[in-house]
C-alpha cells in the first residue's frame, strides 16, 4: 500500500500539518507539538466523511475543508475530552458528534456512546465502542472495516523516556 503525504501550513510560526494517506478511504493528519495536537483520522465513506478527533492545530479546520469539497455529511467521533483532541470541534462544520459521557460534559452536543454502535457507509463498516483507559476515562475507540482500530489516547505511555 502506498502512503502519500501532503504538507499544509497556513500558520508559519507553528508546526506544519501533514496529511498522510493510509489507503483509498483513510488518511490522517499527523500530530504536532506546536501547538500540541492529536492525530486526526479522516475516513471517506460513500455517504459521509468520518473524522476521529479534530485536533487543536489552527490549520486543521482548513485542511479538513479541502478534503470534503462536495460538502458531504460530516460525522465526528471524539476519543476523549482533552483539548488536543477536541480543540477544533467548534471551528469545523459537522452534522453529528459521537463521544463518551465525560467528553459530552465538555462539548454539550451530540450523541453519547455507552455501548457498541455500528454504521455501514457504502463499503465501509464502522464500529464505535467505549474503551477503558488509564489516560482519560470515557474514551471511545473507532474501528474501520475490522482492519483498523483508532484509540486516541486509549493506550498511552504512563511515562516518557528511554526504556533502556
Residue ranges, per PLM feature:
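Active-site HxH/HxHxD metal-binding segment of metal-dependent hydrolases
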Residues: 56-122
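Metallo-beta-lactamase
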Residues: 1-24, 42-57, 94-164
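Residues that form or flank phosphate/diphosphate-binding pockets in enzymes
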Residues: 38, 87, 137
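Short secondary-structure boundary/capping segments
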Residues: 18-20, 32-33, 41-42, 89, ...
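Pre-active-site segment of Zn-dependent metallo-hydrolases
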Residues: 28-40, 44-75
Amino acid at each position: 500500500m502506498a502512503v502519500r503525504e501532503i504538507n499544509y501550513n497556513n500558520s508559519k510560526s507553528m508546526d506544519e500539518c501533514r496529511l498522510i494517506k493510509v489507503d483509498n478511504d483513510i488518511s490522517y493528519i499527523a500530530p504536532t507539538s506546536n501547538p500540541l495536537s492529536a492525530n486526526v483520522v479522516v475516513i471517506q465513506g460513500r455517504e459521509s466523511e468520518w473524522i476521529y478527533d479534530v485536533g487543536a492545530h489552527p490549520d486543521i479546520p482548513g485542511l479538513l475543508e479541502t478534503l470534503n469539497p462536495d460538502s458531504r455529511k460530516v460525522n465526528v467521533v471524539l476519543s476523549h475530552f482533552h483539548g488536543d483532541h477536541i480543540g477544533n470541534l467548534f471551528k469545523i462544520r459537522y452534522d453529528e458528534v459521537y463521544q463518551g459521557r465525560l467528553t459530552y460534559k465538555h462539548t454539550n452536543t451530540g450523541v453519547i456512546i455507552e455501548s457498541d454502535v455500528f454504521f455501514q457507509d457504502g463499503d465501509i463498516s464502522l464500529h464505535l465502542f467505549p474503551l477503558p483507559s488509564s489516560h482519560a476515562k470515557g474514551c471511545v475507540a473507532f474501528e474501520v472495516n475490522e482492519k483498523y482500530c483508532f484509540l486516541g489516547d486509549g493506550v498511552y505511555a504512563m511515562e516518557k523516556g528511554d526504556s533502556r
